[in-house]
Amino acid sequence: MLSVVPRPVVVRAPSKVNLHLAVGDLRDDGYHELNTVFQALSLSDTVSVAPAETLSVTVRGEDARVVPTDSSNLVWQAAEMLAAESGRRPDVEIAIDKGIPVAGGMAGGSADAAATLVGLNALWQLDLSREELDGFAAKLGSDVPFSLHGGTAVGTGRGERLLPVLSRSTFHWVLALAKVGLSTPTVFRELDRLRADGNPPRLGGPEDLMHALTTGDAATLAPLLGNDLQSAALSLNPGLRRTLRAGVAAGALAGIVSGSGPTCAFLCAEADAAVRVSAELAGAGVCRTVRVASGPVPGARIINDAAEGSH
């Protein structure tokens, strides 16, 4: 019998923007109750998994130096989790190519974890169902299940309980990446502090926004975007106000802080408008860099041939 070394499995996973993010009270488990509408965007990370002598993580791309390559990285935890489940050692090399901003509120770490689950499921020929992968994803982090599924979805609980949403058409976004990241726990704590002082108002339900998604009309969707964490992100980084104003002044239909920030996401009427807005924002000096993206797109998907087995 000829034993063929499995080829690396390469997986692409999308970033996300929260079109609606309503943050409830702090729960007994230390998390906040969330009601959110996610949309997966074309700005993505690529993760390659390959057999190795021991578990290792490498990262390249913008801000790669600040991404941990030890057990604090979700991809490491994903590998150990699947290895324990399948009764094997997690002897794989995980290579991450970052396209999603680090600490930008766009679920880059969650995307990498989802990609690792998908990649190792193929590499190790585990034949886990999507539902089984969902269970592992929810244990890894609140945004990991959505990174698996992609598209547009309502998330409840910590954001891990998902219900797909019909979203007609493609929406066009400009993403303004900030010079310095924001820690998600810090932003939630700041929101708790602001609320203890009596501010700010809370978002209602996302029903109108979900209806707007079914129309496929960006102009209808734009005024319905909302994020309870935005006030906290602006409190921690007041310069984001300039970024939001500049994007709308450049022609965006609306601007919003993405998740816990500090990335600002601008919804545009069409692809050409997104290119124009990105050019103006890039020259305005209000952010580190800009990216153009579209959504919804699929969740974590293998983009090369699946691993070959032993023959």
Swiss-Prot record:
It comes from the Bacteria. InterPro entries: GHMP_kinase_C_dom, GHMP_kinase_C_sf, GHMP_kinase_N_dom, IspE, Ribosomal_Su5_D2-typ_SF, Ribsml_uS5_D2-typ_fold_subgr. The keyword Ligase does not apply. GO terms for molecular function: 4-(cytidine 5'-diphospho)-2-C-methyl-D-erythritol kinase activity; ATP binding. SUPFAM superfamilies: GHMP Kinase, C-terminal domain, Ribosomal protein S5 domain 2-like. Keywords: ATP-binding, Isoprene biosynthesis, Kinase, Nucleotide-binding, Transferase. The active site is at K16, D143. Pathway: Isoprenoid biosynthesis; isopentenyl diphosphate biosynthesis via DXP pathway; isopentenyl diphosphate from 1-deoxy-D-xylulose 5-phosphate: step 3/6. GO terms for biological process: isopentenyl diphosphate biosynthetic process, methylerythritol 4-phosphate pathway; terpenoid biosynthetic process. ATP binds at P101, V102, A103, G104, G105, M106, A107, G108, G109, S110, A111. Its EC number is 2.7.1.148. Pfam families: GHMP_kinases_C, GHMP_kinases_N. Gene3D superfamilies: 3.30.230.10, GHMP kinase, C-terminal domain. It catalyses: 4-CDP-2-C-methyl-D-erythritol + ATP = 4-CDP-2-C-methyl-D-erythritol 2-phosphate + ADP + H(+). Belongs to the GHMP kinase family. IspE subfamily. Catalyzes the phosphorylation of the position 2 hydroxy group of 4-diphosphocytidyl-2C-methyl-D-erythritol. This is 4-diphosphocytidyl-2-C-methyl-D-erythritol kinase. The lineage of its organism: Bacteria, Bacillati, Actinomycetota, Actinomycetes, Mycobacteriales.
